[in-house]
Amino acid sequence: MVKVTGGANKRVSLAALIAIKPGCRPRLIYRVHKNHQRRAMDQRKGFTEADYAQLLDAAHQQLAGPLVVVWDNLNAHVSAAMADLVDARDWLRVYQLPPYAHELNPVEPLWSHLKRSLANLAKRNLAQLTALVKTRLKRMQYRPALIDGFLASIGLDLTPFCNPRN
């Protein structure tokens, strides 16, 4: 999450996954959610279960195959509503990371890299910040070696099943 200074309720929320398909380069698939309005007390600030399900649907469509997802224990990932959405997708299998195991999540180094690239950059409004975040994420999508580095940083070795780069 990246906040806009001077905008008490304005924020850009991000959701991403790194997809690994045998024989192919790793892919970064993401969604950006702008929140520029006041929220009700019972309304979530960022992504809902339905938003995460849409991200998974997009990944399924782009990868043209079943998905095995390893998730952290974010409330939206472990909720009953999310379990129902997962159960409705026969092409999806979900596993949870152990609690407090962020060092096993390859998306965490991605967020760290993104935040470092945004440090000391001032944007005047939510639209400018959103455009910058999307540009940085798009650049990462075209750098498979960088994504490989995120995977390697958690100790995941892809050499046994990922040979050619497609």
Outline where the language-model segments fall.
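Short functional hotspots at interaction and active-site rims
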Residues: 1-166
